[in-house]
Amino acid sequence: SLKEIIEALPYQPPFLFVDALEEITENGSKGYYQLKKDEYFYQGHFPNNPITPGVILIEIMAQIGLVCYGIYLAKEKLKDQEALLVPIFTSAAVDFLGPVYPEDQLEVTSEKIYYRFNKLKCLVTCKNILTNQLICKGVFSGMIVNKDKIDQ
C-alpha cells in the first residue's frame, strides 16, 4: 500500500519530506509535501526572508519521485530483504524555475524513463499547489543496493 511505502522510507524527521502519496504505477508516481514554517533550514536560509534551499527541493523530489517510486518497483526484492536494501541517489540535473516559501504545498510527479538492473531514472517535476506554478524539474537517477556492499 502507499502507506507502507512511506513507512519503508529510510528517513526520519526532520529529514522526511513525504506527507502523502496519491498514486504509484509502473509508469510513475505522485506525492505531496507541505513545508512547515518552522523547518530547521529556514533559520539560516534566510533570516527574516525564508526561502527553501534548492538542495532541500532536490531532496523532496528525490524522496517522492525516486525513492518511493523505487521502493514500489523493487517491492518483490523488499519482501525478502527489506532491512538489507537501501536507496542510493546517483545523479540529478535540475532546473529551478521559482522560489518556494514556508507553508507552500508541493506536488511531486515522477515519470519513469527506465528501470533495469535495480537502477531507476525518472523525469521529476515539482509544482506549487497554492500558485499552480512549476517550481523545478529534472532528471533523477538512483538505485537499490544491498547494505552489505556499502559497508565494505
PLM features per residue range, with description:
Residues 21, 90-130:
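Hydrophobic beta-sheet segments that form the core/acyl-binding groove
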Residues 66-109, 137-139, 143:
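Hydrophobic beta-strand-centered segment that forms part of the acyl-chain substrate-binding groove
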